[in-house]
Amino acid sequence: RTAYNGSEALETLDGTVDIVLLDRRMPVMSGNEVLAAIEERGVDVRVAMVTAVDPDFDIIDLGVDDYVVKPVSKDTLVGVVERLETVAEYNDRQKRLTAKKLKRNVLEVEKSRPELEASERFSELQAEIKALETEVQALETEITESRIER
């Protein structure tokens, strides 16, 4: 979807949107205002600021996942979107990993070592945690390397 000003962007924003590209200087509403509205709504999207405004220390508190200074090539923009997709995947996997680790921790506190060792489901949980840890590490490496290439 494409919106030509901040107000249109907010009108079209719903749960099916995964990534938002904003400019700090947009008609009707600034990118910062749109970003504040997105945060207020609690919409789970990755946001990149693509703008001619050079970054300053204020970006530290800006709720964006990436900040790109124009002019931007199509290849760079595609790379930004791909990186944000990877960040979303990373966040999802990290959330799943944390939930599984919390369950494991509860079981380790509440069950005896022999009970844990005898449980096939607990062994499966351990394997799931190990696999997710590997996936999270690989995604983290991918994000870092794509950042360096830019």
Regions from the language model: what does each represent?
Residues 2-11, 31-33:
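Helix N-cap/capping motif at the beta->alpha junctions
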Residues 15-21:
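Active-site beta3 strand of CheY-like receiver
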Residues 22-24, 30, 51:
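Active-site residues of response regulator receiver
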Residues 27-28, 41:
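The feature encodes the CheY-like receiver
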Residues 53-66:
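Alpha4 helix (beta4-alpha4-beta5 surface) of REC/receiver domains from two-component response regulators
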Residues 70, 74:
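A Lys-centered signature of the CheY-like receiver
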Residues 77-91:
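Receiver (REC) domain switch/output surface
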Residues 90-150:
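C-terminal output/effector regions of signal-responsive regulators
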